[in-house]
Amino acid sequence: MAPVKISHVVSFSSQDPKYPVENLLNPDSPRRPWLGCPQDKSGQLKVELQLERAVPTGYIDVGNCGCAFLQIDVGHSSWPLDRPFITLLPATTLMSLTDSKQGKNRSGVRMFKDVDFLAPASGELWDRLRLTCSRPFTRHQSFGLAFLRVCSSLDSLDDSVVGPSALLSSVLNKIREFKTCFFSWSLKKMELEFSPLLLSINLNDLQFAADAEVSTVSNCMFISIALQSAMIIF
């Protein structure tokens, strides 16, 4: 599993100037936590983080600092601001009710992996994380996270990831190969069975249609079906 760098903080709800949210950007530095502002009594903290690239999430290490519950949602930096994120890790307990009320055992480390993630988001490529930390039982103490470490399910970040554009290009190439073979076979068949009719057919027009550049898979499929129909008519 390859570690994924958190490139920057997109937004946050609250921070203590002495323990800012930027402390989460480097989990391997001498650890200083991210804590909410001492005057913030809402009992909830939120932060949105940008990853260096979109990757499938293998596991997430979380160092706790007084947070009772944690939820992790994922999304894409290209999404509009009003589009809701998808839940990767549902609200999960980091402290017991008793410890949270008494302020005991505030520190701890949890590893969340594939079996903890929800199916709609697990295994997909994401480059945004949105963390929601909450401590509803007592609000007189600051809380937050000690560190956050994200790892991809890829063995290396140099591994190729097939995205939509690469997949589309592959499909288009396959369709073009099919059309070339189809025309070669069809013209030979027509030459054997309908040689008198070939005199009245403009083969250049047909070949032009076969070689025409297309931009979407749907257009390719439409042209292929139309050309096959033309062969049946002839």
UniProtKB/Swiss-Prot annotation:
Pfam families: XRCC1_N. This is Protein XNDC1N. One of its GO terms (cellular component) is chromosome. It comes from the Eukaryota. GO terms for molecular function: damaged DNA binding. GO terms for biological process: single strand break repair.
